[in-house]
Amino acid sequence: MTTRLSIKTTEGDIIIRLYDETPGHRDNFLRLAKEGYFNGTLFHRVIEDFMIQGGDPDSKNAPKGKMLGTGGPDYTLPAEFVYPRYFHKRGALSAARTGDDVNPDRESSGSQFYIVWGKTYKPAELKQMERQMELQQEQEIFNQLAKQHHEQIMDLRRNRNRAGLQELQDNLIEETKKLCRQNGKPAFTSEQTEAYT
């Protein structure tokens, strides 16, 4: 079942859907909306072709130029990602959160949300992005393998054993290729390709 709500703005209404697959976020958003929490708040962060962000209670009657984006209730919500079924595409509603470097559990803001404005791409651009994801996957796997062989690498370097280093590097590259084949190439789903083109 999908819950639909209307966000009334000075530019017109925005119809949003809340999904049962994300019950914590759905219930929180509904509760805040029913309490009037969002009434009078602004879309305080608008980035063309990216997203519009709202839900900061500090934006109510905020004077022009006030820094916004840190307000909210005194709680966060556990992550509820349902990827690849739901993903960032034009019109998607998502909970705002701080970055992974300071928020490794990927917890969401208790009230702030954003709507993906989105950008469309040419098929060739999506293919290039897939190639970039593939290269990133290869680099991450290689780095993990190299980390596992750190002491061996350091010993070979200390002993200036270039042949040994080259042999180890070749072995790590082959192991990387093997693991990449097992994992499969990163690729956009047909739904993502349709949404982004």
List each model region and its residues.
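Cyclophilin-like peptidyl-prolyl cis-trans isomerases
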Residues: 1-197
